[in-house]
Amino acid sequence: MIDHTHLRLFQFCDSQFPTGAFSHSFGLETYIQRNIIHDDHTFIAWLKMFLQEQLTYSDGLAMRLVYDALENDDTQKVLHIDKLMFVQNLPKETRVGAKQMGTRMVKLALELYNSPWIAWYHQQMQDKKAKLNPAICFTMLGHHLGVDIETIIDYYLYQNVSSLTQNAVRAIPLGQTAGQKIVTHMIPYIEETRKQIFELKEADFGMTAPGLELNQMAHENVNVRIFIS
C-alpha cells in the first residue's frame, strides 16, 4: 500500500509546484552562457557539484539541525538557522530568490495543512524575525506529517535535482528523455549526499565551492536571461 503521508510531502517535490523554482537556475545560466555547460555530460558534472556542495553544507545540514530543533521545541535554534541561511547566501539573486521561494512555500503549506510550526514560522516573518527558507519550511512540513528526517532530506534533494534538470532542459537545451535519464542517473548521488549530511558537524555549515558563488554573483550582469538567478 502507498504511504499517503509520503505522497503528501512528495507533492511539494513536483518541479511545477508553484514556489517559483522554475524561474531560478542558481548560477547554472551563467555556466551555460560561458559555454562551460553545453550538453548532458557537462550539466551532470555541475549538478553533482551543486548537490554535493551547496545542497550539502547549506540546505541539507540546515534541515538536519532544524529537525532536531523541532523535536526539542527549540524556537531560538530555528530562528538562528534561518538567519544563517540568509546571511551566508552571498549572491544577491540567490539570496533574494531563496527568500521568495521560502515565502511562497510557507503560504502554500499553510493553505494545505494546519501545521503549528509553519504557522509560527510565518508569524516570525511578519514580526520581522525570520526571512523564510524553503529548506526549513520543507523540514517543518515533513515533521508535521510524521516523516523521518532521512526521507525528508531525500525528497528535498530529489526536488532540487528534478527542478534544476527541467531548467537545464529548457536552457541548454536538452531533450525531455535526456532530462529523465539525468534524474535517474542522479538518484544514487542523492543517497550519497544524504549520508554525507549526517556525517557533518554544525561547524561545517555554509562551506560552498567559490566557483558556484562567483557564477551566481556574475549572473547579475548577464544581458540575456530566462532565469531570475
Curated annotation (Swiss-Prot):
Offer one Pfam family short name for this entry: UreF
UniProt family annotation? Belongs to the UreF family.
Query: What Gene Ontology cellular component terms go with this record?
Result: cytoplasm
Keywords in alphabetical order, please.
Answer: Chaperone, Cytoplasm, Nickel insertion
Q: What does this protein do?
A: Required for maturation of urease via the functional incorporation of the urease nickel metallocenter.
For this entry, the protein name equals: Urease accessory protein UreF
Q: What domain of life does the native source organism fall in?
A: Bacteria
**Annotated S-S bridges:** none
- The gene designation is ureF
Which GO terms of the molecular function aspect are on file? Answer: nickel cation binding
Per UniProt, subcellular location reads as: Cytoplasm
Record-linked HAMAP family: UreF
Kindly state the subunit structure of this protein.
Answer: UreD, UreF and UreG form a complex that acts as a GTP-hydrolysis-dependent molecular chaperone, activating the urease apoprotein by helping to assemble the nickel containing metallocenter of UreC. The UreE protein probably delivers the nickel.
